[in-house]
């Protein structure tokens, strides 16, 4: 069956090359591939009438999305046909292309065309399909804001153009949130979007709280509709075998009911919005987020009333759905053989372990980073343990490239932003001569990209890696002591994990076995707090999560499976 359900005009299929003219070899899809974390497969929808200043229901625009907190500058290009129920957005000059078809029955269809690098080093394209559901339909995705509530506040010269400046300003106590749009053109004539800046949670893209800026160019209301919405020829698309909510990111859902207005609940939600700078674009999204917040807040309050050894707190994730939280976890399962070396058990005989250890105090750990909307936790755990090993060898802390692993390690079973494994990343590093520094390869993009490892200078070479024996905390402590930070995996699916704040985390609902692990983190130490032994974990969900990005995880009962799949590298 053809992958795309919508009709195409004869002779209007798109050529198999990206916007830079690079050609791609086409491979048949893998018979089995992992579940996707598809935040980019479904989009925020905007109503056709963007009053008081309408951009029209059909438009094409390109630009750059800047996320200062994630250190990302991401070029994009978008084609939107609201009335036709279809949109296409491509990132990094066509490296990744997403399509949304909201009119495809019954609940819309989304596609993601992404680059992949084969074992032979060839750049190929893969296509993945996600069907919308009644609960999570696929919507048209807009890259322009809904301007309801904006007012003209002045005029500025920006980017060589005279612009009208529109703002929607909200005061939150001592803080204020300002949403600003620069439009070129007269007040009564055609307007061209130039820049949209917002501080807070982005209702357009659904990522972490931050300051976002979209700079637009080449806005037009005319483009070849059918051609631009045709999937590339000769790239078969495969659906997800077992669709889960994480594959249908909750973006502007249709709600079947309207909650009653409760003054106390409204006040709690407003305080959350004040604290985290939230701004919602329309009444439907506001209600949706308020409900998410209330359900999560009730869970947090109930947990804290039980006086457990760790506390939860509302954070930047409190208005998220379970599906959106699941998208932050990117560990895959694999049937590939693990080539790790056996652990040197003889070293356990007469080892004298310190009572506590924290590699941060010795300068072996880079700052906490934000994986953004990419399921790349495995790459952060991999680079973290390599950075520590390199520090122990040379005395220098060199940030290594997660992006290189995301772009290049497909041939060993990793799937870029849709998940991977640390030991498969080790196999790729060892087989390809090493791993580059972040400075040499280029900045982290939070998106799949085309591999260009041959143009980078390698910063570390790998002789092998060691699998730490599972369920053996003494062996894990020894590995941490002698080899630096260790890559570990945990079950991060309990809701309490998302809202951890402080104390020693112990969650009976956490899985303990290998098959229950779903998130990779970096083990940087261990210790004792009020009689409770803990592991010190570094996460990649930004410093806004946990205790400045870190967690104290109980050693008791191998909670969350931290000792089930630990590895460390051996450098050349």
Locate each region found by the language model.
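N-terminal leader/targeting segments and the immediate start of mature chains
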Residues: 3, 24, 33-86, 118-126, ...
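Non-transmembrane domains of secretory- and envelope-associated proteins
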Residues: 41-50, 146-149, 158-159, 172-174, ...
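Flexible, processing/modification-adjacent segments and terminal tails
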Residues: 43-55, 105-177
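Short beta-strand segments that buttress and anchor functional surface loops
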Residues: 61-66, 87-92, 163-172, 196-202, ...
């Amino acid at each position: 069956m053809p992958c795309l359900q919508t009709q195409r005009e004869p002779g209007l299929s798109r050529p198999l090359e990206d916007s830079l003219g690079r050609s791609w070899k086409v491979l048949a899809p893998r018979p089995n591939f992992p579940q996707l974390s598809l935040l980019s497969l479904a989009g925020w929808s905007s109503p056709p009438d963007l009053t008081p200043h309408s951009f029209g229901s059909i438009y094409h625009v390109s630009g750059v999305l800047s996320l200062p907190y994630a250190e990302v500058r991401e070029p994009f290009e978008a084609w939107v046909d609201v009335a036709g129920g279809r949109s296409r957005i491509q990132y990094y000059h066509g490296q990744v292309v997403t399509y949304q078809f909201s009119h495809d029955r019954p609940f819309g269809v989304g596609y993601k065309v992404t680059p992949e690098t084969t074992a032979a080093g060839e750049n190929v394209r893969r296509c993945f399909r996600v069907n919308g559901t009644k609960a999570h339909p696929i919507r048209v995705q807009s890259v322009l804001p809904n301007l309801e509530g904006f007012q003209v506040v002045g005029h500025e010269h920006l980017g060589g153009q005279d612009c009208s400046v529109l703002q929607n300003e909200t005061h939150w106590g001592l803080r204020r949130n300002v949403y600003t749009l620069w439009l070129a053109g007269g007040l009564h004539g055609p307007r061209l979007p130039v820049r949209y800046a917002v501080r807070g949670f982005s209702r357009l893209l659904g990522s972490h709280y931050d300051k976002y800026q979209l700079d637009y160019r080449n806005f037009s209301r005319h483009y070849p509709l059918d051609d631009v919405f045709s999937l590339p020829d000769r790239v078969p698309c495969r659906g997800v075998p077992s669709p889960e909510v994480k594959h249908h990111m909750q973006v502007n859902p249709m709600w079947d009911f309207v909650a009653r207005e409760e003054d106390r609940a409204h006040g709690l939600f407003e305080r959350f919005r004040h604290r985290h700078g939230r701004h919602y674009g329309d009444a439907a999204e506001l209600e949706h987020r308020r409900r998410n917040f209330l359900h999560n807040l009730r869970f947090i309050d109930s947990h804290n009333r039980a006086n457990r050894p760790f506390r939860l707190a509302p954070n930047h994730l409190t208005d998220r759905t379970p599906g959106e939280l699941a998208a932050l976890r990117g560990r895959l399962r694999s049937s590939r053989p693990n080539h790790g070396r056996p652990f040197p058990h003889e070293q356990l005989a007469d080892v004298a372990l310190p009572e506590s250890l924290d590699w941060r105090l010795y300068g072996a750990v880079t700052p906490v980073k934000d994986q953004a909307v990419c399921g790349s936790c495995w790459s952060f755990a991999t680079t973290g343990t390599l950075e520590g090993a390199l520090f122990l060898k040379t005395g220098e802390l060199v940030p290594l490239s997660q992006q290189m692993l995301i772009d290049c390690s497909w041939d060993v079973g990793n799937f870029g932003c849709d998940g991977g494994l640390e030991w498969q990343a080790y196999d790729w590093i060892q087989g390809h001569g090493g791993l580059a520094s972040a400075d040499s390869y280029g900045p982290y993009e939070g998106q799949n990209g085309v591999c260009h490892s041959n143009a980078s200078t390698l910063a570390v070479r790998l002789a092998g890696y060691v699998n730490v024996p599972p369920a053996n905390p003494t062996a894990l402590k020894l590995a941490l002591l002698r080899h630096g930070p260790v890559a570990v995996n945990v079950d991060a699916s309990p809701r309490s994990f998302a809202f951890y704040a402080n104390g020693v985390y112990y969650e009976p609902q956490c899985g303990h076995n290998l098959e229950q692990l779903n998130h990779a983190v970096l083990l940087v130490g261990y210790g004792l707090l009020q009689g409770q032994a803990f592991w010190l974990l570094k996460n990649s969900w930004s410093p806004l999560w946990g205790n400045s990005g870190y967690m104290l995880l109980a050693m008791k009962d191998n909670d969350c499976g931290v000792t089930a799949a630990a590895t460390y590298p051996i450098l050349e």
